[in-house]
């Protein structure tokens, strides 16, 4: 390898090894481009012994195969743990659409919670392939299916066909990673929420979130409200949540509060 492991993780591994923790190996993913902005080197590779980087985990009673080496970030988004659990009460018997499903986490939680049918959508072939594997791993392949499509293209097609869902979930990637692109991000969030609301049955539910700290809570809330007015929907807020507590919010750092997660009941204006 051309670059050494990050000093922090390398030192932790060394100390744990010296203390008899018997950690045989670590796969480090300090490869985010943002490290360069901070003058930090990027590193991706093993510390200690090598091992199979396709691992199985369990969260909320749902099992997943996780690709630590080549998956997005570290292969799984742990910050949504309790938000995934929050949808369980809505899902029994429901027809569910999960947009930007990644490796199927929200879709699989919906299936485990008793949804009648779940369709997960993602533009990544690798993500959809893993999501299908995860459905089989949990015995959900008969009720939870996945398609590899661009969500912005698929939702208007579903609307044109007259499709309706009891519950639509939006978990998109960050539409903005800088202040300079907030304006375009607002358009993206407004459009995707507008399209999703059109697919929700009268009295059905929408879960929607943003993982960009540049899209603050006030602006995100305003954008969702604009989308609802544009399609003549009234929103009843069921829940507002943020990231899991192992991703703590630091009051001295606004950027640490980055994840916003809403559940709404969507009602047609009469």
Predicted regions located by residue number:
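Single conserved hydrophobic/aromatic residue that forms the stacking wall/gate
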Residues: 2-13
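Non-catalytic substrate-recognition/targeting regions of SAM-dependent transferases
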Residues: 11-76
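Conserved class I S-adenosyl-L-methionine
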Residues: 93-100
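Conserved SAM-binding loop of SAM-dependent methyltransferases across substrates and taxa
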Residues: 103-115
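Conserved SAM-binding motif I beta-strand of class I
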Residues: 117-122
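S-adenosyl-L-methionine
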Residues: 129-166
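Mobile active-site "lid"/loop adjacent to the S-adenosyl-L-methionine
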Residues: 165-195
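C-terminal catalytic and target-recognition region of SAM-dependent MTase-like enzymes
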Residues: 191, 205-270
């Amino acid at each position: 390898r051309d670059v050494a492991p990050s000093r922090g993780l390398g030192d932790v591994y060394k100390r744990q090894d010296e203390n008899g923790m018997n950690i045989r190996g670590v796969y480090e993913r300090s490869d985010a481009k943002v490290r360069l902005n901070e003058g930090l080197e990027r590193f991706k590779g093993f510390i200690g012994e090598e091992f199979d980087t396709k691992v199985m985990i369990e969260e909320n009673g749902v099992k997943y195969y996780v690709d630590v080496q080549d998956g997005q970030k570290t292969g799984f988004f742990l910050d949504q743990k309790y938000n995934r659990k929050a949808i369980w009460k809505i899902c029994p018997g429901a027809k569910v659409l999960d947009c930007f499903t990644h490796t199927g986490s929200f879709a699989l939680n919906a299936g485990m919670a008793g949804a009648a049918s779940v369709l997960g959508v993602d533009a990544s072939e690798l993500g959809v392939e893993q999501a299908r594997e995860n459905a089989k791993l949990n015995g959900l392949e008969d009720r939870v299916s996945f398609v590899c499509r661009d969500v912005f293209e698929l939702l208007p097609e579903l609307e044109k066909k007259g499709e309706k869902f009891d519950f639509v979930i939006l978990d998109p990637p960050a539409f903005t990673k800088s202040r300079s692109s907030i304006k375009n991000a607002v358009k993206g969030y407004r459009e995707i929420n507008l399209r999703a609301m059109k697919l929700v049955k009268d009295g059905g539910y929408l879960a929607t979130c943003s993982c960009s700290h540049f899209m603050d809570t006030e602006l995100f809330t305003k954008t969702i409200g604009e989308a609802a007015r544009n399609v003549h929907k009234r929103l009843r807020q069921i829940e507002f949540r943020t990231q899991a507590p192992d991703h703590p919010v630091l009051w001295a750092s606004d950027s640490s509060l980055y994840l916003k997660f809403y559940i709404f009941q969507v009602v047609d204006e009469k």
